Amino acid sequence: MCIRDSYTPEEVERLRGSIKIEYSMCKMQSQKLWRLLNTESYVNTLGSLSGNHAVQHAKAGLKAIYLSGWQVAADANSAGEMYPDQSLYPYDSAPKLVETMNNSLIRADQIQHMEMIDGDMDKSKRTDYMLPIIADGEAGFGGPLNVFELTKKFIRAGAAGVHFEDQLASEKKCGHMGGKVLVPTGTMIKNLKAARLAADI
């Protein structure tokens, strides 16, 4: 069964509301990521935890950025605390960081664009600053409703892709640690369907 099969087009349209909202950054970046994944043998990326890091990744020639949950937990969460990789930080921290990184990338692109128009920069030395960001959604910070809301926040922030772990959110541990508690397969499928619905709406 395909994840999309849970909701009919009519149900999605009904939930969408009368105002069609376009998230151009997310759409552009997800299409770019899809092209990369289908044309490159691999897509090398590094973890980034600030807007400046994202700009430096672009200048270094990377084609995508990874936003790791452990980095958000350790150093880049909205609580300003240092946490272990156990999803203890505020759930909106990673989407806020995606937005910050995209704002920095957009600004770097604007500066470069002005410099090229003004003749201060050779167009052949152009840097592609608009790198797709792949975000770690941890274990979703709860059940399907939480995954739905978190996915909406990532889309609004312009994430190109999000992945979710199949761990029980309330017992989440760092991926390389023992003693992890996994959710039943049916629960994980519900989480993925909720994320897909958020993207469709």
Q: Model features per residue range: what roles?
A:
Residues 1-3:
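Short, small-residue-biased leader/transition segments that mark boundaries at the very start
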Residues 70-98, 144-145, 151-152, 167-190:
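Glycine-rich tight-turn/loop motif centered on a GG-T
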Residues 38, 42-55, 59, 89-97, ...:
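Glycine-rich anion/phosphate-binding loops
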Residues 161, 181-201:
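Phosphate/pyrophosphate-binding betaalpha-module
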Residues 39-44, 62-63, 129-131, 159-160, ...:
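Short, well-ordered coil/turn segments that N-cap beta-strands
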Residues 48, 53-119:
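Active-site cofactor/substrate anionic-group-binding motifs, chiefly glycine-
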Residues 44-48, 65-67, 131-137, 162-164:
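Hydrophobic faces of well-ordered beta-strands that scaffold small-molecule active sites
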Residues 27-38, 98-127, 192, 196-200:
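Surface-exposed amphipathic alpha-helices with a cationic face
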